[in-house]
């Protein structure tokens, strides 16, 4: 049975006709294992992958060989020859993408993160540069459809049946707060309730006090490595609200339920005030938002800070803790769960990511839609094909231990920190197809993964992130213009310049209240439009 439509579908979307970075393979040059059959030159498919530093793609040390093996296997199985050309990009990905699209260059697939912060879905949807995959996935890649059907696919489909990109299917529960445990205990604090001789850090007040004591031990001017968006993912937001500056939620405004930017709501004033106080006191850096990922990692590894939340996904925190341990064998680490505002508070929670944290879009001008869908149908036809495209050649680049875990071949343990292959040709991760756990995790690391990051009770309830909304040109202009003053006010707080709770020039409202009220009044019509879509899609999902 075909997927449930969100609205009556008026006309079928026609697939583009077949037609005519950095190269990751030699076109049609390899001999396959199938009797030495030589694969002919294939149809070229160009992939752009990247995003902000935490989402950047890194080419593996054996990347070209893995991609060639995948191209060969696909040719053996189907008789179709493809040559992938991949540009592994970082924060400049969107600039390069815009330039290439404007120049008419071939770009077929774009892979990046979704939702806000110049997410892939917002950019391509807003600029009408994506190919609507609503029918193509179901009709031409049924194996892919089976792997993404339900909430993941719904979250990348608008109320008008526009599927912007292929969604990842990954656990939405993956955050934590990495702390130098030895510094924590030396400062007189603990995360262990049984250590009654030390102060238990389960709230923001004691966390702040711990950080200031850490500064005395390290001699550094701040204790936490992390930008404002990282703080709101795991530290400051959940103690006060369900959505912050970088997210939206359902709130009550003048008696009406509205989907609103969390950064303009009454509750957010306490979040922003906390971040301002931390910048002033030295809990966080006043330049936190400009710290690059590599620089932030280096600072923590060198012992200059005691808390690390820059890209606070648990796998990244474990990677950083291991690198820090290698440099300082005496250092110990722990991962904290979400913190309350005070000892007597109850509210807490990390932000939950959508299952579709990442997406792969096909550009509107691509002439390779058929070829891409056929390839993905093959990738998602079996766990073996998916694992080849995700991990590399089994027995060469990774080992399946048969117990739900994987490891690396003897002598290739370095692949744990310097991967052989990026996993690029699944386009996005899909844990429904394969969800192997690295066998090299310690018991403590597994505790962090399963009991801290993986505990659904540690997360804010906010389903707005699971919906994809459309905007009109008029509303985009209104929202863009209205955001300027609100953003300036937020930056002044993040950098410790202006207290958001100080009295504004009107003598009646705080600085925050004045900016937030003005923003809300200007975007009210926009919020109502988004809220209508939210209610429609929620009703259709049942």
For every predicted segment, state its role.
Residues 10, 18-542:
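Extracytoplasmic/secretory soluble proteins
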């Amino acid at each position: 049975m075909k997927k449930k439509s969100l609205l009556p579908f008026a006309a079928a979307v026609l697939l583009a006709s077949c037609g005519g970075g950095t190269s990751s393979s030699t076109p049609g040059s390899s001999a396959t294992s199938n009797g030495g059959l030589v694969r002919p030159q294939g149809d070229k498919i160009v992939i752009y992958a990247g995003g902000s530093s935490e989402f950047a793609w890194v080419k593996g040390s054996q990347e070209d060989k893995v991609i060639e093996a995948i191209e060969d296997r696909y040719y053996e199985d189907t008789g179709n020859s493809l040559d992938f050309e991949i540009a592994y990009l970082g924060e400049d990905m969107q600039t390069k993408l815009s330039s290439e699209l404007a120049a008419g260059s071939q770009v077929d697939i774009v892979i990046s993160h979704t939702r806000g912060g110049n997410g892939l879905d917002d950019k391509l949807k807003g600029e009408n540069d994506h190919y609507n995959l609503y029918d193509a996935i179901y009709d031409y890649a049924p194996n892919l459809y089976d792997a993404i059907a339900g909430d993941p696919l719904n979250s990348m489909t608008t109320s008008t049946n526009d599927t912007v990109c292929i969604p990842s299917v990954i656990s939405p529960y993956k955050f934590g707060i990495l702390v130098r445990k030895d510094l924590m205990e030396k400062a007189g604090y603990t995360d262990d309730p049984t250590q009654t001789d030390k102060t238990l850090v389960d709230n923001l007040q004691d966390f702040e006090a711990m950080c200031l004591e850490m500064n005395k031990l390290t001699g550094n001017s701040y204790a936490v490595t992390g930008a404002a968006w990282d703080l709101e993912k795991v530290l400051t937001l959940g103690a006060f609200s369900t959505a912050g500056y970088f997210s939206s939620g359902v709130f009550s405004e003048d008696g009406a339920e509205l989907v609103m930017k969390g950064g303009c709501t009454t509750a957010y004033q306490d979040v922003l005030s906390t971040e301002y106080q931390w910048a002033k006191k030295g809990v966080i850096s006043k330049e936190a938002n400009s710290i690059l990922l590599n620089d932030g990692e280096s600072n923590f590894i060198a012992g200059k800070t005691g808390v690390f939340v820059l890209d606070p996904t648990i796998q990244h925190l474990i990677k950083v803790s291991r690198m820090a341990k290698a440099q300082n064998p005496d250092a110990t680490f722990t991962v904290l769960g979400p913190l309350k505002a005070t000892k007597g508070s109850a509210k807490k929670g990390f932000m939950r990511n959508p299952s579709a944290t990442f997406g792969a879009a096909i550009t509107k001008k691509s002439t390779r839609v058929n070829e891409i869908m056929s390839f993905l149908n093959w990738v998602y036809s079996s766990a073996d094909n998916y694992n080849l495209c995700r991990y590399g050649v089994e027995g060469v680049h990774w080992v399946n231990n048969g117990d739900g875990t994987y490891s690396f071949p003897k002598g290739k343990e370095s692949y744990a920190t310097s991967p052989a292959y990026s996993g690029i040709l699944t386009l996005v991760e899909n844990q429904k197809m394969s969800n192997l756990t690295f066998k090299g995790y310690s018991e403590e690391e597994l505790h962090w993964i399963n009991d801290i990051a993986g505990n659904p009770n540690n997360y804010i309830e906010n389903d707005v992130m699971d919906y994809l909304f459309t905007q009109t040109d008029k509303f985009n202009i209104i929202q863009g213009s209205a955001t300027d003053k609100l953003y300036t006010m937020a930056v002044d707080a993040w950098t410790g310049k202006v207290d958001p709770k100080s009295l504004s020039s009107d003598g009646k409202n705080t600085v925050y209240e004045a900016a937030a009220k003005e923003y809300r009044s200007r975007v009210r019509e926009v919020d109502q439009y988004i809220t209508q879509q939210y209610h429609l899609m929620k009703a259709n999902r049942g």
